[in-house]
């Protein structure tokens, strides 16, 4: 099941909002170690202290010590992969899953940011609104009662 995220830059706060879109974002909230999770059926994932991370609104496995299990992060409008380009993300994530040296969580976060902002700047999109599909992952999105999950650009 793919999770759809709506990404929108909020220039007043200089943050990128990631909002769940569609049926994947609905469900009964359940309290967990990472906050409210949309479904109790999502399998548990080893976690790390993510207080220093600014990336929000991604599946629980994005903050796992084993790394995220999703291998696709694509633009739904063009259906082209944005983060699998020069750094070969699936290989990086596979190495992290095996416990081998790979890109750190902080570097992975910066990589997501760079790809998103680079696409927007190079394409000259004024609205800066895209829907992304995060696929290949059985984990649900991390949901919070706040109106928007943020990942900051600072």
Curated annotation (Swiss-Prot):
Region feature Mitochondrial targeting sequence, mapped onto this chain: 68-117
Family matches, as InterPro entries: Transactivation_prot_X
Alphabetically ordered keywords of this record: Activation of host NF-kappa-B by virus, Activator, Apoptosis, Host cytoplasm, Host G2/M cell cycle arrest by virus, Host mitochondrion, Host nucleus, Host-virus interaction, Modulation of host cell cycle by virus, Transcription, Transcription regulation
Post-translational modification summary for this protein: A fraction may be phosphorylated in insect cells and HepG2 cells, a human hepatoblastoma cell line. Phosphorylated in vitro by host protein kinase C or mitogen-activated protein kinase. N-acetylated in insect cells.
UniProt GO BP: DNA-templated transcription; symbiont-mediated activation of host NF-kappaB cascade; symbiont-mediated arrest of host cell cycle during G2/M transition; viral genome replication
Top-level taxon of origin: Viruses
Location in or out of the cell: Host cytoplasm; Host nucleus; Host mitochondrion
One Gene Ontology CC term in the entry: host cell mitochondrion
Predominant location category: host cell
Described function: Multifunctional protein that plays a role in silencing host antiviral defenses and promoting viral transcription. Does not seem to be essential for HBV infection. May be directly involved in development of cirrhosis and liver cancer (hepatocellular carcinoma). Most of cytosolic activities involve modulation of cytosolic calcium. The effect on apoptosis is controversial depending on the cell types in which the studies have been conducted. May induce apoptosis by localizing in mitochondria and causing loss of mitochondrial membrane potential.
UniProt record similarity statement: Belongs to the orthohepadnavirus protein X family.
Assembly and interaction partners: May form homodimer. May interact with host CEBPA, CFLAR, CREB1, DDB1, E4F1, HBXIP, HSPD1/HSP60, NFKBIA, POLR2E and SMAD4. Interacts with host SMC5-SMC6 complex and induces its degradation. Interacts with host TRPC4AP; leading to prevent ubiquitination of TRPC4AP. Interacts with host PLSCR1; this interaction promotes ubiquitination and degradation of HBx and impairs HBx-mediated cell proliferation.
UniProt name for this protein: Protein X
Native source organism of the sequence: Hepatitis B virus genotype C subtype ayw (isolate Australia/AustRC/1992)
């Amino acid at each position: 099941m793919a999770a759809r995220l709506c990404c929108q830059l909020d220039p007043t706060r200089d943050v990128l909002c990631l909002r769940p879109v569609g049926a994947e974002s609905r469900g009964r909230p359940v309290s967990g170690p990472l906050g409210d999770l949309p479904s109790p059926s999502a399998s548990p994932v080893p976690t790390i202290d993510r207080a220093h991370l600014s990336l929000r609104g991604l599946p629980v496995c994005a903050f796992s010590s084993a790394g995220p299990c999703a291998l696709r992060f694509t633009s739904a409008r063009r259906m082209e992969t944005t983060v699998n380009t020069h750094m070969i993300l699936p290989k990086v994530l596979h190495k992290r899953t095996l416990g081998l040296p790979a890109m750190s969580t902080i570097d992975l976060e910066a990589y997501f940011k760079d790809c998103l902002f680079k696409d927007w700047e190079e394409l000259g999109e004024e609205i800066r609104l895209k829907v992304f599909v995060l696929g290949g992952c059985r984990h649900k999105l991390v949901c919070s009662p706040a109106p928007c999950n943020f990942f900051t650009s600072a």
